[in-house]
């Protein structure tokens, strides 16, 4: 099966990476190689692309595709999570890089491949692991976690106002039978949310599925650490581009980038800074970049995408 993934905000991302032909660039989420391919087109034989993805299938399918695009530039592909960018660079004797890209969306391939269990529109085993080597699955969470912990996950990671009822219904349902598939979970969620609240708006299971995916893959903790390590790796003038798809991720990126721009922790009443923390970067755009109408028509999944860009000082 070919890895189908339409890159989001492609033109805007490539433009903001400000690619140098001899530069070193990290794509922390290779996916279908849409962004990676465009980066490679702009590199010469002195340039390097480091592509990471915790989905083994993405790495396998990208290898051949990328070599066909540019056989002269150095291509390093690693089946790992982007949280390990420092270790990957150390292993390859790379001290600093010119640009880093993270596209935090679940790829169209993963959404469409039923067996991954990411989609509430297709019945499949409850999995949701980006990296199939991981032990924690959505099935384990809904069948083994306590009601309060399930409620916390759905409330905090899904921003779901019906989190308490959904958690209660999950715990009741599993007393009768283990919850094994996405279809079973969708039915439980629909039963938990009053019909009046389900009229209009997104699919009733959307927020709960998002929450479980974030919990299974520790997405928010990993993101904050990667921003810290990635900024450290960047050369002065190097850029960090991150595409988010929901408010939780965007808030973390916004807050972490702002810490790099204004790291001072002195009380506001202090006339001068005494903490000694120096800015590490500047925001390239004050507001996030969002897709143009034309892109939304061609790719509705891009609707919630936001791109934020930090430039290292």
From Swiss-Prot:
S-adenosyl-L-methionine binds at residues 33-35, 53, 82, 103, 110. It is found in: Cytoplasm. The keyword Repeat does not apply. Its main location: cytoplasm. Belongs to the methyltransferase superfamily. RsmH family. Coiled coil: none annotated. GO terms for molecular function: rRNA (cytosine-N4-)-methyltransferase activity. It comes from Acetivibrio thermocellus (strain ATCC 27405 / DSM 1237 / JCM 9322 / NBRC 103400 / NCIMB 10682 / NRRL B-4536 / VPI 7372). One of its GO terms (biological process) is rRNA base methylation. This is Ribosomal RNA small subunit methyltransferase H. InterPro entries: RsmH, SAM-dep_MeTrfase_MraW_recog, SAM-dependent_MTases_sf. It catalyses: cytidine(1402) in 16S rRNA + S-adenosyl-L-methionine = N(4)-methylcytidine(1402) in 16S rRNA + S-adenosyl-L-homocysteine + H(+). GO terms for cellular component: cytoplasm. Specifically methylates the N4 position of cytidine in position 1402 (C1402) of 16S rRNA. Its EC number is 2.1.1.199. Keywords: Cytoplasm, Methyltransferase, rRNA processing, S-adenosyl-L-methionine, Transferase.
């Amino acid at each position: 099966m070919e890895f189908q993934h339409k890159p989001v905000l492609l033109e805007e991302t490539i433009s903001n990476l400000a690619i140098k032909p001899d530069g070193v660039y990290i794509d922390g989420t290779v996916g279908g190689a849409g962004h990676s391919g465009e980066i490679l087109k702009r590199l010469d034989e002195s340039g390097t692309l480091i592509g990471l993805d915790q989905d083994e299938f993405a790495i396998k399918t990208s290898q051949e595709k990328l070599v066909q695009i540019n056989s002269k530039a150095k291509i390093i592909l690693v089946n790992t999570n982007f949280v390990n960018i420092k270790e990957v660079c150390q292993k390859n004797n790379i001290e600093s890089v010119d640009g880093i890209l993270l596209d935090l969306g679940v790829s169209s391939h993963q959404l469409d491949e039923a067996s991954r269990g990411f989609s509430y529109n297709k019945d499949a085993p409850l999995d949701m692991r980006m990296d199939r080597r991981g032990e924690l699955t959505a099935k384990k969470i809904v069948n083994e976690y306590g009601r309060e912990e399930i409620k916390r996950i759905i409330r905090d990671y899904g921003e779901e106002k019906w989190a308490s009822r959904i958690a209660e219904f999950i715990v009741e349902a599993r007393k009768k039978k283990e919850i094994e598939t996405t279809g079973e979970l969708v039915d439980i969620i629909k039963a938990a949310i009053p019909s009046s609240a389900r009229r209009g708006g997104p699919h009733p299971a959307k927020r709960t599925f998002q929450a479980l995916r974030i919990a299974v893959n520790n997405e928010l903790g990993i993101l904050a650490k990667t921003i810290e390590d990635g900024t450290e790796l960047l050369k002065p003038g190097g850029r960090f581009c991150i595409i988010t798809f929901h408010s939780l991720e965007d808030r973390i990126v916004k807050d972490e980038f702002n810490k790099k721009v204004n790291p001072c922790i002195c009380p506001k009443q202090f006339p001068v800074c005494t903490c000694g923390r120096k800015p590490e970067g500047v925001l390239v755009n004050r507001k996030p970049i969002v897709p143009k109408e034309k892109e939304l028509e061609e790719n509705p999944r891009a609707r919630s995408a936001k791109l934020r860009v930090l430039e290292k000082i």
